[in-house]
Amino acid sequence: MGLSHSHSVETRQLVEKTGFSAEQIEHLHKRFNSLSGDLLTIRKGHLNGISDLEVNPIRSKIVDAFFDKRNLRKGSSGYVEEINFEEFLTIMSYFRPLSQNMDEENISVCRKDKLRFLFNMYDTDNDSKITLEEYRKVVEELLSGNPNIEKETARSIADGAMLEAASICVGQMEPDQVYEGITFDDFLKIWEGIDIETKMHIRFLNMESIPSCR
């Protein structure tokens, strides 16, 4: 799409859909073109080439999130092969800075959207819960860059975190009771009181240089 400072109908529609300002959309369109090489779509390979992601231990999960149909609000599981600029904006909207005049209801919606995005990164098999094995894998990946932490230690950390999640969400469990995994409602409880609204950002796409939404 061609964007200009004369707010086109298409740009206004994107403003309404994503919550970004026209100025922010212009900035992100330049970044999209830089990533895609001025093509109309980007694929995983375009994001894999971002230097800031090369040392990120969960790079593959971050890249996959851009192509996850759940995050693209397509209402189904699986991944798309490529995304266009509007779909790119949809993903970037999860990282959109909060507006200073945003009311409590909109802040709550924004928070829930961000947490759903994170939940989807953990819930790799799309069964609506994060199992112990899924959580272990993420923890192992996060700690893989630390040579002083062995795999078994990472597994123990994941196991402990899952037990804590169970105590928060279920309470006192019976000795023979099995916690099958973290549901999205559980996930909301675990993150309660944590300021995800302002902490969740995306550094490798230069979001810091984008003005906050008005």
UniProtKB/Swiss-Prot annotation:
Positions contributing to Ca(2+) binding: 123, 125, 127, 129, 134
Gene3D superfamilies, per database record: EF-hand
One BP annotation, GO: protein localization to plasma membrane
Keyword Ion transport carried by entry: no
Xref: InterPro entries: CHP3, EF-hand-dom_pair, EF_hand_dom
Notes concerning its domains: Binds calcium via its EF-hands. Calcium-binding mediates a conformational change. Can also bind magnesium.
Quaternary structure and interacting proteins, as annotated: Monomer. Homodimer.
Protein's name in the database: Calcineurin B homologous protein 3
Species name: Xenopus tropicalis
